[in-house]
Amino acid sequence: MWIGIISLFPEMFRAITDYGVTGRAVKNGLLSIDSWSPRDFTHDRHRTVDDRPYGGGPGMLMMVQPLRDAIHAAKAAAGEGAKVIYLSPQGRKLDQAGVSELATNEKLILVCGRYEGIDERVIQTEIDEEWSIGDYVLSGGELPAMTLIDSVARFIPGVLGHEASATEDSFADGLLDCPHYTRPEVLEGMEVPPVLLSGNHAEIRRWRLKQSLGRTWLRRPELLENLALTEEQAKLLAEFKTEHAQQQHRHDGTGDA
């Protein structure tokens, strides 16, 4: 996968290219990231990249000409088929389904805004889609772009150490992930669930699915509203709810004689 970045601070993306899963993907040639700064497309000695908005008001906007020229340079480098995305709080909210959708693109160009944003006409003429990572305001589009890159890169074949990792992540099937455990077997009196030590893969799968359903019900119940549960899932969720109620009953001490 190739990703082009339009940013006034391209050096921020070293966090993506030099470290972790994405850094390994770049090193192994599975992910390629190039960047263009609008400052390199200015024509004045101050390398000005911002301008006042028409109609007044606080703040500045990114200048049209340097931004458009940077986008055009990225498009030229990408060739045909690159989708141009503007990271914006007004865009479609990124979720796992959206990540999976974006991962089907071989080429992406991510435009990172600064100041109060960019000229609406640039959005109309240069941008294919707007995406947001949440209902809050950041100082620029770089962190959302890095979030998008990291999440999308996990779907590139060969990037993750275990091929099933991306499909088993939280939200991959619309549910939160189940709890995970590693050594030691007992930590300050807390034991690993015995089923995980049993070697019974069918029971382990069933336990993990039950915990995934239950954790989603407890923490993000709205996610279940959009899911058509299978007969097995509905049964496991009912079991979890019963077990949870019993645990709460014992915890509250109301079960004492």
UniProtKB/Swiss-Prot annotation:
It catalyses: guanosine(37) in tRNA + S-adenosyl-L-methionine = N(1)-methylguanosine(37) in tRNA + S-adenosyl-L-homocysteine + H(+). Its EC number is 2.1.1.228. It comes from the Bacteria. One of its GO terms (biological process) is tRNA N1-guanine methylation. S-adenosyl-L-methionine binds at residues 113, 133-138. The keyword Plastid does not apply. It is an enzyme of class 2 (transferase). GO terms for molecular function: tRNA (guanine(37)-N1)-methyltransferase activity. NCBIfam families: PRK00026.1, trmD. This is tRNA (guanine-N(1)-)-methyltransferase. It comes from Cronobacter sakazakii (strain ATCC BAA-894).
